[in-house]
């Protein structure tokens, strides 16, 4: 049987990435060109800057991904691309490059939901058994997803306001930490104590929804009031207290979801899945189901995860036409 190679593209935000997946499960290359240094001085991602960077490096990323995989353009058998959710200008760069490559070589084009990519990155650890539950935590999303089979995703709970990664970056900015602040807050949290009383919104309510805006506001108010009074606060203790509140919320809702949807596997994915504190809480508290977390290199935005997610779409022959457009607000279906 002839080997099949998927060339995957991911440009939904501030990472330009191209990857090659062989025979559905062997990631031969996963090239990532990060823009973090360009966005640091702004304290967040600037959409126009992100789009320009994607345009500048996308061709080089394609060439490097093919070279690292040890294949040529003629060896590629399908092309996959993120078409949403994300920044519309950024999405269009990767999607346009993918469409051009597929059209030029007469290859099928596979549309992939960015969040499905995060979820299916867990496939790199071991074959997934369905049905399963997923906790997706990133800079733009916080949601619980029920997956009955590969490619069938239903949201069963999500944030009402801020995503967890967004909350990390906003409190990090208040403390003067470097963007993105998640890793530094995690490290500082392990050096401090949970001594500040921050709210855990909806933690006792019988639903699967999250809310982090109240926690973020309480943190900002505490920090601001201390500055106004000339009081000194421990950055380590602030981080420890903030992270403890976040983890209490995530764990409470995830446990409720596992009670409502009895599955054997919990996937935890997205950029915040790299958080050491979250991994520690999961290991200590979720012991009756298998917990699968992608390796660190596949937690952030990358094309490797898009390649993994495209496999089920390819098997279903869910191909896109040349009129496929970016959908910045693309979402999974919601399940009551």
Swiss-Prot record:
Organism, as annotated: Streptococcus pneumoniae (strain ATCC 700669 / Spain 23F-1)
Binding site for Fe cation: 114, 118, 301
Name of protein: tRNA N6-adenosine threonylcarbamoyltransferase
Enzyme Commission designation: 2.3.1.234
Co-factor binding comment: Binds 1 Fe(2+) ion per subunit.
Single GO biological process annotation from the record: tRNA threonylcarbamoyladenosine modification
Cofactor or coenzyme needed: Fe(2+)
Chief location bin: cytoplasm
Location of the protein in the cell: Cytoplasm
Entries under InterPro entries matching the protein: ATPase_NBD, Gcp-like_dom, KAE1/TsaD, Peptidase_M22_CS, TsaD
Annotated residues for binding of substrate: 136-140, 169, 182, 186, 275
Molecular function as annotated in GO: iron ion binding; N(6)-L-threonylcarbamoyladenine synthase activity
Function, in words: Required for the formation of a threonylcarbamoyl group on adenosine at position 37 (t(6)A37) in tRNAs that read codons beginning with adenine. Is involved in the transfer of the threonylcarbamoyl moiety of threonylcarbamoyl-AMP (TC-AMP) to the N6 group of A37, together with TsaE and TsaB. TsaD likely plays a direct catalytic role in this reaction.
Domain of life: Bacteria
UniProt family annotation: Belongs to the KAE1 / TsaD family.
Highest classification ranks of the organism: Bacteria, Bacillati, Bacillota, Bacilli, Lactobacillales
HAMAP family the record matches: TsaD
Record's GO cellular component terms: cytoplasm
Keywords from the named record: Acyltransferase, Cytoplasm, Iron, Metal-binding, Transferase, tRNA processing
Reactions it catalyzes: L-threonylcarbamoyladenylate + adenosine(37) in tRNA = N(6)-L-threonylcarbamoyladenosine(37) in tRNA + AMP + H(+)
PROSITE patterns from the UniProt entry: GLYCOPROTEASE (PS01016)
């Amino acid at each position: 049987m002839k080997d099949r190679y998927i060339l995957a593209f991911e440009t939904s935000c501030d990472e330009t990435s191209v990857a090659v997946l062989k025979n559905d499960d062997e990631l031969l290359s996963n090239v990532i060109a990060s823009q973090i240094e360009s966005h640091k001085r702004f304290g967040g991602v600037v959409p126009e800057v992100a789009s320009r960077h994607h345009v500048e490096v996308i061709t080089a990323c394609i060439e490097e991904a093919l070279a690292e995989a040890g294949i040529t353009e003629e060896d590629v058998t399908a092309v996959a691309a993120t078409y949403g959710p994300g920044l519309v200008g950024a999405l269009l760069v990767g999607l346009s490059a993918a469409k051009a490559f597929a059209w030029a070589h007469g290859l099928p084009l596979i549309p992939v939901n960015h969040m499905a990519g995060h979820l299916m990155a867990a496939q790199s650890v071991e074959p997934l058994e369905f049905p399963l539950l997923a906790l997706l935590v990133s800079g733009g999303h916080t949601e619980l997803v029920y997956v009955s089979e590969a490619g069938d995703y239903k949201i069963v709970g999500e944030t009402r306001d801020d995503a967890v990664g967004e909350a990390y970056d906003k409190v990090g900015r208040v403390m003067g930490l470097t963007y993105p602040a998640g890793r530094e807050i995690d490290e500082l949290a392990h050096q401090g104590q949970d001594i500040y009383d921050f709210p855990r919104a909806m933690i006792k309510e019988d639903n699967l929804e999250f809310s982090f805006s109240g926690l973020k506001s309480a943190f900002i108010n505490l920090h601001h009031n201390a500055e106004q009074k000339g009081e000194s606060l421990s950055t380590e203790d602030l981080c420890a207290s903030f992270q403890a509140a976040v983890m209490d919320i995530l764990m409470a809702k995830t446990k409720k979801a596992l009670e409502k949807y009895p599955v054997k596997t919990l996937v935890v994915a997205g950029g915040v899945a790299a958080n050491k504190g979250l991994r520690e809480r999961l290991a200590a508290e979720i012991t009756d189901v298998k917990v699968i977390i992608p390796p660190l290199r596949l937690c952030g935005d990358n094309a490797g995860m898009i390649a993994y997610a495209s496999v089920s779409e390819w098997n279903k022959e869910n191909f896109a036409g040349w009129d496929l457009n970016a959908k910045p607000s693309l979402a999974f279906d919601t399940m009551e």
